[in-house]
């Protein structure tokens, strides 16, 4: 189950609530970002890692982790610290045979095609709200988590506010359907248990 959408739209909170209610594992796609010393990590015009660039993360590794979690019921994934721009540890995620796996992140929509090709995709949702509310929540979150210095957060936040319509349109182009977090929570809460996949 892919949850994509603009930064700050409520993807992580939605995933946490669903996980708490149903026991579904959550794969944070942010944990697959490249580290600060990776020569392939794109840079923004203001000199910091460009977390909003499609090449800023390891998409293939994320797909492989999701496949292992669904097929094997267990996978080890990295733990990434945005503030440090580095992997700070590892964690093991487990899934029951009938669990849905929630994969949330800005670029989740880019996984629609490869996951569908492997028979792993249940649905893809683009979580969105009023973009000014999203911008305010994003700034509050990033400031509280000390992700970057305040002046950088302001500049990045304004850029993301302007760019949000493109982000949403791109998610839709990949096949994600737009939905408010509350509506998504209501819909997903009523899902039947996941059917066991056929042999691939």
Give residue ranges: language-model regions.
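The conserved Walker
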Residues: 7
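Post-Walker A helix-loop "phosphate-sensing" segment adjacent to the P-loop in P-loop NTPases
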Residues: 20-30
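Conserved lysine of the Walker
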Residues: 11
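Hydrophobic anchor at the beta1->P-loop junction of P-loop NTPases
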Residues: 3
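Conserved nucleotide-sensing/catalytic segment adjacent to the nucleotide-binding pocket
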Residues: 25-26, 34, 39-85
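NTP-dependent small-molecule kinase module
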Residues: 96-97, 140, 159-200
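ATP-dependent NMP and nucleoside kinases share a basic, alpha-helical "lid"
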Residues: 88-147
